[in-house]
Amino acid sequence: MTTLKIKTDKVEKPLNKEALIADKQTVKTPKEKMDNSGRFYATGKRKNAIARVWLKPGKGQVIVNKKSLDQYFASETQVKTILQPFTLTKTNNQYDIVCTVRGGGISGQKGAILHGISKALAQSAPDFHAVLRKGGFLTRDSRVVERKKYGQHKARKKTQFSKR
């Protein structure tokens, strides 16, 4: 029986307790994406919709595709769900928001704006990150429409089966 000897170029260093403690204490914080005019930028996605969100300190004005939030979304419940991150972090009427949304329908665009606002809020104040994560606003909803398969009526619906 032959034995193989493996040569390694790496020299193992003795473990340093201080280095290990320093590694454990480093916590991931979201990167600041602030532009020159003091706005926080984030992108949100939901289904086929992509929202680009700019957040800056202000009076609580929300503009979506050059329209006010009430003009863009007809339903009051949609407006309330978009503003949920502010009620959760208790920052109502403290930030101005400008969004551009493309693709998808109204529901997907609403979810994309909500996701983008949450990410921008988490960048503006690091202590909001844990609150928004716990509320489920920072996780991207990855559910998308399943594609239609050939030989079938829809994605899952098949033609009626006849035994005889």
Swiss-Prot record:
Entry keyword Transcription: no
Family stated for the protein in its record: Belongs to the universal ribosomal protein uS9 family.
InterPro entries named among the record's database cross-references: Ribosomal_Su5_D2-typ_SF (IPR020568), Ribosomal_uS9 (IPR000754), Ribosomal_uS9_bac/plastid (IPR023035), Ribosomal_uS9_CS (IPR020574), Ribsml_uS5_D2-typ_fold_subgr (IPR014721)
GO molecular function: RNA binding; structural constituent of ribosome
GO cellular component: cytosolic small ribosomal subunit
Database matches in PANTHER family: RIBOSOMAL PROTEIN S9, SMALL RIBOSOMAL SUBUNIT PROTEIN US9M
GO BP field: translation
Pfam families the record matches: Ribosomal_S9
Organism of this sequence: Rickettsia bellii (strain OSU 85-389)
Keyword Coiled coil annotated: no
HAMAP family: Ribosomal_uS9_B
Top-level lineage group: Bacteria
UniProtKB keywords: Ribonucleoprotein, Ribosomal protein
The protein's name in its UniProt record: Small ribosomal subunit protein uS9
